[in-house]
């Protein structure tokens, strides 16, 4: 039987998992908007792959502590739902800006989760997952600056 602390850890991990699922969905919906921009498409595919890898890593961590991984996406999945089929109509600059906002939200989610995790999982997040989130955020921030220029 899990303790209250374990439940808090599982809850925090599931929040991160939902955010990562949302990110993957969002990138899937955004990619059609950049079909004619190979370099930008490559950057978005790389960010999507990073989020997908984090989905798998967080799922494993949840299972290792005896939890049930979330299956539904979280808050920034709203982007994916909002642009379902319409990313091309938004234009690539709007898509990049929106993805950067999602990446920013992801940074906050990771920071907020840290105090609720046990020591081992805190290390996983701070040394592996959070740096990956910082990287995808940096990529999207740089692309947003280019889009704004």
Model-derived features: where do they sit?
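Carboxylate-rich helix-loop segments that flank metal/cofactor sites and access channels
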Residues: 56-94, 98-107
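Short, charged, low-complexity loops and linkers
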Residues: 1-11, 60-62, 85-91, 145
């Amino acid at each position: 039987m899990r303790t209250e602390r374990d439940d808090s850890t599982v809850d925090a991990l599931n929040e991160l998992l939902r955010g990562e699922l949302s990110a993957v969905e969002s990138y899937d919906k955004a990619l059609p908007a950049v079909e004619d921009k190979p370099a930008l498409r490559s950057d978005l595919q790389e960010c999507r792959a990073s989020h997908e890898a984090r989905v798998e890593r967080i799922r494993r961590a949840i299972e290792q502590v005896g939890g049930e991984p979330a299956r539904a996406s979280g808050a920034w999945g709203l982007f994916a739902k909002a642009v379902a089929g319409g990313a091309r109509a938004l234009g690539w600059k709007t898509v990049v800006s929106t993805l950067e906002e999602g990446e920013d939200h992801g940074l906050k989610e990771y920071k907020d989760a840290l105090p609720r995790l046990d020591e081992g999982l805190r290390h996983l997040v701070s040394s592996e997952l959070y740096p990956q989130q910082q990287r995808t955020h940096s990529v999207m921030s740089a692309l947003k600056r280019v889009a704004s220029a």
